[in-house]
Structures are given as C-alpha cells and as structure tokens.
C-alpha cells in the first residue's frame, strides 16, 4: 500500500468510534495513539492523521491536504464539496428533521404551506428541502440552540439533527418530518482516489468487512 496516506478525522462525538474503527481495521497500533494525544497532526506507522473540526474535513480532503476523511453525512450534504463519498460507516446515527412548536398546528402540514421561515445550522440543506416541496422559505442561519428560534418568534420551524428527540420534547417541539438519515461516511480526495485506486479500495474493503456496509457506486478511475 502507498506509504503516507493521510486521514482527516473529526473531533467531537464521532472521534472515539472513529479511532476504534481505525484500530480494528489495523491502521493504528494502539487506540491511545490518538485518544491520549493533544497533537493535531499525528503519524502512526505509514499513516498520518489530521484531527480537525468536522466542518473542515471536506475542505482538507477536497484540496488534497488529506487523502481520506471520515465525516458525518450532514456535513457532506451541507457543503457538497468536490469529493468522493466511498462508504457508509454506520455509526454516529441521527437524522435531519423539520420540527415545530407543538402548539402551532398551522405549520405541522408542510404540504399546505406556501411560505415558511425556517431556522437551521444547515441553511443549504434547509433551502433545498423546502425548494423541493415548492415552499418559499426564508432561511435564518443559526450557530447554536436552534430550538430557541420558534419559541421566541424568530422562525416558524427548525431544521436540525435529531437523535433521541429529547431536546425537542424538552422545548415543546415536535418532529414534523424526517428529511434524511445521517451517519459517518468515508470520503476521498478525487485525485488521490484515482492515483491510489488500489490502496484506497483496499482500505474501503477493510472498513466494509468491519461495518458490513455497501460501497457506493462511485467510479474511482
């Protein structure tokens, strides 16, 4: 295999499972190499690991600073960078959903709306979703506590990631509709995927054997 493949890895909630996957696949000698280090660039054997914010991973991969990356489907859908999506890694499960105040039934049936004001940390996903419904949407970009927006009259609905739904319930919000399921994905730089086709396919195979996933229909040549 190519000596020197570089992985971009996500800080935060996906990090422990990502490290575990890399270890089980044989790309790390010990999990502690990543879990106990405060370095942002770490070499272990022939591999280099860049530890960064999930939202920066598509940038590192697209521009060739990393050959491969592991990142949530939410980031991929929001940014739509020029990268290959190779494999569903089947962890970090949640979903995009539209939610609204329980006591505002006029926005519960999205099919009857002609316009809506939506708050989200994912404005591009939100715009595309409502455009697909034929609903004019004013999208307000949020950076945190998106559940607050409909409670104070800033928005009619929100589009956000939902896991257990507990945060929605605690804020008297209900899920109106699911937009799409979200999991961690393996992505690749387009040039690296062609130049190191054999090496990257071998990596995909190792991950696939562990997670039982199906490789997307992507032509790496």
UniProtKB/Swiss-Prot annotation:
Cellular component (GO) terms are: cytoplasm
Q: What is the organism of origin for this protein?
A: Carboxydothermus hydrogenoformans (strain ATCC BAA-161 / DSM 6008 / Z-2901)
> Mind listing the UniProt keywords for this protein, alphabetically?
Amino-acid biosynthesis, ATP-binding, Cytoplasm, Glycosyltransferase, Histidine biosynthesis, Nucleotide-binding, Transferase
EC numbers for this chain: 2.4.2.17
Domain of life, source organism: Bacteria
Q: Which gene encodes it?
A: hisG
Q: What is this protein called?
A: ATP phosphoribosyltransferase
The GO molecular function terms of this record are: ATP binding; ATP phosphoribosyltransferase activity
The principal localisation class reads cytoplasm
The pathway where this protein functions is: Amino-acid biosynthesis; L-histidine biosynthesis; L-histidine from 5-phospho-alpha-D-ribose 1-diphosphate: step 1/9
Function noted in UniProt: Catalyzes the condensation of ATP and 5-phosphoribose 1-diphosphate to form N'-(5'-phosphoribosyl)-ATP (PR-ATP). Has a crucial role in the pathway because the rate of histidine biosynthesis seems to be controlled primarily by regulation of HisG enzymatic activity.
């Amino acid at each position: 295999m190519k000596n020197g493949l570089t992985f971009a890895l996500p800080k935060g909630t996906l990090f422990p499972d990502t490290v575990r996957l890399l270890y089980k696949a044989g790309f790390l000698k010990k999990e502690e190499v990543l879990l106990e280090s405060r370095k942002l660039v770490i070499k272990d054997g022939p591999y280099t690991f860049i530890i960064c914010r999930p939202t920066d991973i598509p940038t590192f991969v697209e521009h060739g600073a990393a050959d491969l990356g592991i990142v949530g489907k939410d980031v991929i859908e929001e940014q739509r960078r020029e990268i290959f999506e190779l494999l569903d890694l089947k962890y970090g499960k949640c979903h995009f959903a539209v939610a609204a105040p329980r006591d505002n039934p006029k926005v519960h049936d999205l099919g009857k709306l002609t316009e809506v004001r939506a708050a989200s940390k994912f404005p591009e996903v939100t715009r595309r979703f409502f455009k697909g419904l034929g609903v004019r949407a004013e999208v307000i970009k949020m950076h945190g506590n998106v559940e607050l927006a409909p409670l104070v009259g800033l928005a009619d609905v929100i589009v956000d990631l939902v896991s257990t739904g507990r945060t929605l319930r605690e804020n008297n919000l209900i899920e109106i509709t699911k937009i799409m399921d979200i999991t961690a994905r393996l992505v690749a730089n387009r040039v690296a995927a062609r130049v190191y086709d054999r090496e990257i396919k071998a990596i995909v195979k190792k991950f696939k054997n562990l997670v039982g996933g199906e490789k997307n229909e992507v032509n790496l040549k």
